[in-house]
Amino acid sequence: MRNGMRKIIAGVFIFVFLISNLYADLVAEVTTGVIQKPLVTVVSDNVVDQFPQQVNSVIVADLNHNAKLQANDTIKYEIKQKQNIPWKSLKSDYVVLTKYTNNSYNNYTVEVQILKRNDTSYLQAITYKNINVSLMRTLAHKISNYVYQKLTGNQGFFLTKLAYVKVSNPYARYGRLYELIISDYDGYNKHVVLRQTDNPIATPSWSNDGRYIVYSSYSGGSMGVYTLEIATGKVTRITNYKGINSSPSFSPDGKEIALALSKGYSDQTNIYIMNLSTKALKRITINGINTAPKFSPNGQSIVFTSDREGRPNIYVASVNSKYPQSSILSTKIHQAYEPNYTPDGKNIVFMNQSSRTSGTQIADFNLANGSVTNITNGKADSSPTVSPYGDMVAYISTNTRGYSSLDMVSLDGDNHFNIETADNGNILIQSPSWSPKNF
């Protein structure tokens, strides 16, 4: 029995990267759709200094990494005043005019003006003072958030973070290196916050205040769930049950986690809610293999994967039920894994294995009308995580050679961007988790 259980526990961890190679003989492709979005041109009063050019380049990249705007910096000469903007030759709907004042060595004041075609007044303006050049990318993301919010009415996500796992030598018997990495949303400013050899790190998930990451790991001869305090690097083990302890995620208020436990050497796992103060458990499911739980934004429901009817699918359970009970999300879905609510609670994004297509894609389920829409068209797409304001989804894609990449797609499926690519098959990228807020 114990030998069988060890195989099950090992399988939980290797599934994360084996799913990437499950369809290794098939090509993963994502196409970018064509959609008419307002065009923003970013211009500057300084095209000589390196700092203004760098900031504006990041702003343009940010404003192209979303579903609502597109941007360019086609004007390569200085524009000092709004009267100098060549609107007739521009196809832009808006211009973002950036003005840079070099106060002292490596210190700038930056004024940002948003102008609209056929409008002689400033639409919006803001000034950032005493900016050190070391904060170049942070400043650019702040400006992008400002512009995005003013032009779309939605909060920008350009100061959010991504946590993900990088595995080196993943197929070696010994010497496998697992690193938990936090980066900017666009893959820059990477920091390794946890490093382990031969002890897997799996399914990291943020707390809503952005202070903690909860994850599962196999350490000291057994599987457990841990929290990492990001500011200090302090790691705390919070479960020590026999068998499987996996797939943890925080409740919206941060007082509980949902997780999957086998509670002994069983081939079944069930969903539980753990109170982090008392460590008391509430059981949510009663049969089958149940895993990957995520709370709804209001904390009243949990969505998860279960094979109770013969194949993996998505189920929903109320956290307030007196007895364990849950229902299948939709009979339209053939096989599904790794569900995530969007922040408004109106959609569920998941890994979809349709009966009509080969491989796995990232799909969106509309809770209002029950529609299911694939938003990627690769053959081995997995591990979706939704941006904190719901516009974008980050996920893992794997190509025919087994190379994994961290990619991003808009929720409507029209825009696709690469964040990071493993340059050889000896490195795997796994389990992305989008931070709950801007930093």
Curated annotation (Swiss-Prot):
Keyword presence, Kinase: no
Subcellular location field: Periplasm
Keyword Cell cycle: yes
Matching InterPro entries: 6-blade_b-propeller_TolB-like (IPR011042), PD40 (IPR011659), Tol-Pal_TolB (IPR014167)
Pfam families per the UniProt record, alphabetical: PD40
Keyword field: Cell cycle, Cell division, Periplasm, Signal
Signal peptide residues on this chain, from the entry's feature table: 1-24
A single BP term in Gene Ontology: cell division
Predominant location category: periplasm
GO cellular component: periplasmic space
Self-association state and partner proteins as the record states: The Tol-Pal system is composed of five core proteins: the inner membrane proteins TolA, TolQ and TolR, the periplasmic protein TolB and the outer membrane protein Pal. They form a network linking the inner and outer membranes and the peptidoglycan layer.
Annotated function: Part of the Tol-Pal system, which plays a role in outer membrane invagination during cell division and is important for maintaining outer membrane integrity.
Family of the protein in this entry: Belongs to the TolB family.
Protein name (record): Tol-Pal system protein TolB
Organism (species): Francisella tularensis subsp. tularensis (strain SCHU S4 / Schu 4)
GN (gene name): tolB
